[in-house]
Every structure is written in C-alpha cells, then in structure tokens.
C-alpha cells in the first residue's frame, strides 16, 4: 500500500508565502514609476500639444527629415492604447525596439537610449503606465516618405546603430557620476537631441553630446567645452527655472523638457547629471 505524502500546515503556509513573495517581487512600484516617467520625459512625446489634451494619449508630432512621426497612445485602453500588452511586451519594446507582433519600431522612439534602462525601473514604469486613466483616443498614423515606411529596413539600421542592453556603470567613477550617467544616457535620453546624426539618422557616437539639430535648429554642446562658462549652480538652476546665467531663455523644445522633466527631478539627481557632464571628454562644437 502506497503512503500518501503528509503536508503540515506550516509547510503549506511556507509554500504559499514563497509563491506570494516571488509574485510580489515581480510587481513594479507605480509611485516610483511616476518619477521615472518624468525623468524619461514620456508625457512630452505622448501627449498632443494642445490645451486639454489627454495625457499619454498620443498625437504629438515629431517632424524629421524622414517624415512626421506621431507619439502613440500609451494609456491602458485595450483598443487605442497598450491595455492588451504584457509586461514582457513593454520590456521588449523598450529594450529591443520591437512591437508585440515582433515588427521593428522606428527609431523616432528613442529605444536606442531606453534600452539602457534597468529592468527593475522598466517594471516600475510599466506599473505606472497601467495605473493611468485609459483614453480611447486613437493613435495617429505616421506620415513618412514611401521608402521610409518599410519597417524591415530598420533591421539594417539597428545592425549599424543600435546596441541593446542595460546601462553598465563606469568603472572607477563615483556613485554620483554613475547616477548622472544613467539619467543622461538612459532615462533622460539627452543624446537623442544633443548628439549629431548622419544622413541615415544614426548618432555619431564619437561626438556624443557635442551638439545636434532639432527642427533645423542647433542644439547646444553639453560637453565641458560647451559648458565651460557655466558653474554647477548655473546648470542646476537652468534645469529647474529655465533661465541661462545671462538672463536668456531656452528654445521652446528645451523649455518643455525643463517644464515636464528636469524641473521635476530631485536636487540630488540634478547634481548627479551635472557631475556626469563635467567628466565627459571636451569636444568642440
């Protein structure tokens, strides 16, 4: 006669507790994700530039030499937004620039920077996006030239200009510098605008943060060569209040970044960003 296994109440509770603990550990922190979403500037690209537009419901236009891209609806609406996505779908989009169906995203979506976001931060961002009120506003289709509509060509572009993978700390750098590097390189994706690009839209990595162009206008050099007249205090105040040391104001695009993103960061994170910019190689404009 076979003996049946006997489970004590303590054993059952232990198994249940362990399963709960594993599940809880995998859940993101929506409150922390809210801060990360500000640091990543999500609202700027995913909210239409008009008064009363629903936040994160898409419609914001991004004009490029390849056509006009529109930020999609990223609210949890199951039809218009990303309500049917899984957490894995979201992480794949951010880390690898791929849609749930496996197709490439165009690199107007800055996954070339977001790929560096650490996985626990991605989970927190996902938890925050799921907590948003859903909007049924449909995403607008991109308006691109015929040749640039072919998503399969992005595979070649990725081979040339995209290296997926989470941020790796700078060896020998201080904790503050590494925190600043993470904010600048990954979440803040500063290089997307402040690094020059070639005719294919690929970033010129040897000129990282040495200045670029947006809408045909020059974007400043953020290396020590471009910031040599700015004190640390000047930089931090600019990122909060939007005023240069000589009393001037930034472009409309940068003013929006300050309003939506950098002014929402903690003083410690702002100081870390400045600390990182100070240790970059000085590159001429």
Language model feature labels by segment:
Residues 11-21:
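Bacterial N-terminal signal peptides
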Residues 22-38, 155-185:
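Electrostatic cytochrome c docking/interface patches
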Residues 33, 39-49, 90, 125, ...:
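The canonical Cys-X-X-Cys-His
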Residues 2-13:
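Bacterial N-terminal signal peptides that target proteins for export
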Residues 88, 97, 102-128:
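Membrane-embedded segments
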Residues 101-103, 191, 200-201, 229, ...:
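Substrate-binding/catalytic groove segments of enzymes
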Residues 61-92, 112-122, 207-246, 256-270:
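Electron-transfer interface patches adjacent to heme c in soluble/periplasmic c-type cytochromes
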Residues 137-154:
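Extended, well-folded interaction surfaces typified by the phenylalanyl-tRNA synthetase beta subunit core
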């Amino acid at each position: 006669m076979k003996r049946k296994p006997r489970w004590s109440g303590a054993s059952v509770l232990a198994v249940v507790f362990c399963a709960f603990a594993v599940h809880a550990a995998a859940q993101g922190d929506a409150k922390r994700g809210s801060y990360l979403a500000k640091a990543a500037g999500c609202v700027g690209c995913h909210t239409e530039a008009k008064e009363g537009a629903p936040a994160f419901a898409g419609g914001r236009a991004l004009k490029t030499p390849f056509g006009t891209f529109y930020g999609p609806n990223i609210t949890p609406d199951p039809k218009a937004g990303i309500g049917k996505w899984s957490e894995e779908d979201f992480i794949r989009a951010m880390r690898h620039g791929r849609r749930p169906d496996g197709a490439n995203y165009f690199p107007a979506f800055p996954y070339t920077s977001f790929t560096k976001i650490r996985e626990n931060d991605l989970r927190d961002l996902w938890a925050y996006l799921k907590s948003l009120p859903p909007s049924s506003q449909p995403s607008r289709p991109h308006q691109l030239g015929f040749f640039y509509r072919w998503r399969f060509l992005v595979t070649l572009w990725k081979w040339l200009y995209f290296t997926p993978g989470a941020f790796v700390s700078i060896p020998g750098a201080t904790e503050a510098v590494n925190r600043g590097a993470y904010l600048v390189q990954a979440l803040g994706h500063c290089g997307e605008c402040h690094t020059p690009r070639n005719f294919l839209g690929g970033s010129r990595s040897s000129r990282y943060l040495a200045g670029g162009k947006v809408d045909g206008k020059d974007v400043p050099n953020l290396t020590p060569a471009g910031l040599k007249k700015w004190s640390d205090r000047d930089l931090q105040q600019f990122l909060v209040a939007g005023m240069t040391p000589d009393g001037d104001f930034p472009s409309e695009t940068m003013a929006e970044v300050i309003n939506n993103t950098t002014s929402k960061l903690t003083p410690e994170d702002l100081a870390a960003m400045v600390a990182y910019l100070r240790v970059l190689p000085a590159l001429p404009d």
